Amino acid sequence: MEGKDAVAIRSIVSRAKIAMTDQTPGFKVDPAFVKVKQNNQTDAFYTTQRKLSGGQTNGGSNNSNDKHHYLQDAVRLTSSQAMAAASTGAGSSSGTNVGGSSGGNSVLIPLPRSAALTHTQQQVQQTTSTLQTPVYARGDDGTYALAIDGGDYFLANNKRDFTKQADILLYRYLQAKSNNFKENGVEFSLNLLESGSLFQTWAQTGLTAKLYGALVAMMGSGQGTQVKGSVQGSSRAASVSVQTTQQSRQQSTDTQESEVVKLAKALLKSSADLAKPFTDNPTFKKALTDIQSEYKDYLAAAGKLSEFKKDLGEVS
């Protein structure tokens, strides 16, 4: 019988309506949302994370106690190797075909750095003499090292491949079932886009995201209306719900205004230009258009991540 992991990856790809092939086209991601600069592997973030994941400081000494030590090497395995490693190291059922029906697909499996390896894991490690060029991606729960496409995933063409995104989520799904799910106080989460998730918090704390939410709030309701802003995994970065006076009275007294409202009011107080009627302010309208354009690719990615997360939840 097909295991849960095979169902998970098959469901993900089915919903995305994309065949799992190495030639699968990706969609462009704004470089602003990727810490590593396009075609620049000497970026300070890249080199720093490379040293940290390798257990070295700038001076080359051992850095095993560093807070980034939880980063693990990830290798790309064939479906048969992944099945063996997953059943032994991640608690999967022995009949799981992680790679799905095509058989030639691969999945990411973590290999422990110092823990004693089982015989199966030793065999898997022996088949992978050298890791591909690692890719350091900033996710909702921090920065983690992934070995995909020799660095092409983020660095070479600045695209994010749907199939590889599915692989990453499955990797984290398997990781969630292993003893290494929590290490050195660091926890991983599949809750990417729901209210209160770390991904949502990261998105809301970005200045551009806050500005976007503030502009939408002001455009939709004006200065005096209370709004509730939230970043959703859909076609918008900020979903603004305008509350009437009657609805506001019905809410508990401890309801607080969102950060976007506070920022909106601050902008209104600090800028006479922004305080003008918004529909008559060409500068404001142009700024809003520019920001919406900047978020276009990011919103498409967020929508796909939301679908992936839903599928994983259904089979968990």
Swiss-Prot record:
It comes from Mycoplasma pneumoniae (strain ATCC 29342 / M129 / Subtype 1). It comes from the Bacteria. Transmembrane segments: none annotated. Residues 82-105, 238-257 are annotated as: Disordered. This is Uncharacterized protein MPN_485. Residues 84-96, 239-255 have a biased composition (Low complexity). Belongs to the MG307/MG309/MG338 family.
